[in-house]
């Protein structure tokens, strides 16, 4: 399993990456999560403009085996949904790059830094 060092992680297996402006971030699911889910066939997300609290559900991932909720890693506003998700298998193929789910304006960049780093996530998953 791949666990990039430059991301932060949640116990629910989402990742978040602050972009260069320091207040916008990309969010996706981890390689561990996509592997556990199996073949992803559909992703449903709340609309751009939706304001979320930390841990609030912002969508679902439907796989052949199951359906899983997606939880906001931090509070913020959804700015953009990944257009490539029309082909949901991109999440399996490239979860950390082309398979990102949403771009969001984070309410507090400090909240991102408080999430799990790569080593803590590695310990959580046993990888």
Curated annotation (Swiss-Prot):
One of its GO terms (cellular component) is glycine cleavage complex. GO terms for biological process: glycine decarboxylation via glycine cleavage system. It holds the Pfam family GCV_H. Binds 1 lipoyl cofactor covalently. InterPro entries: 2-oxoA_DH_lipoyl-BS, Biotin_lipoyl, GCV_H, GCV_H/Fam206, GCV_H_sub, Single_hybrid_motif. The keyword Amino-acid biosynthesis does not apply. The glycine cleavage system catalyzes the degradation of glycine. The H protein shuttles the methylamine group of glycine from the P protein to the T protein. The glycine cleavage system is composed of four proteins: P, T, L and H. This is Glycine cleavage system H protein. The gene is gcvH.
């Amino acid at each position: 399993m791949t666990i990039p060092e430059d991301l932060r992680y949640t116990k629910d297996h989402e990742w978040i990456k602050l972009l260069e402006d320091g207040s916008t971030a990309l969010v996706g699911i981890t390689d561990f999560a996509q592997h556990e889910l199996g073949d992803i066939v559909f992703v449903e997300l709340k609309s751009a403009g939706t304001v979320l609290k930390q841990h609030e559900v912002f969508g679902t991932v439907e796989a052949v085996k199951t359906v899983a909720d997606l939880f906001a890693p931090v509070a913020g506003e959804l700015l953009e949904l990944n257009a490539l998700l029309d082909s949901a298998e991109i999440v399996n193929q490239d979860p950390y790059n082309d398979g990102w789910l949403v771009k969001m304006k984070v309410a507090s960049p400090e909240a991102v830094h408080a999430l799990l780093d790569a080593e803590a996530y590695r310990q959580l998953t046993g990888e």
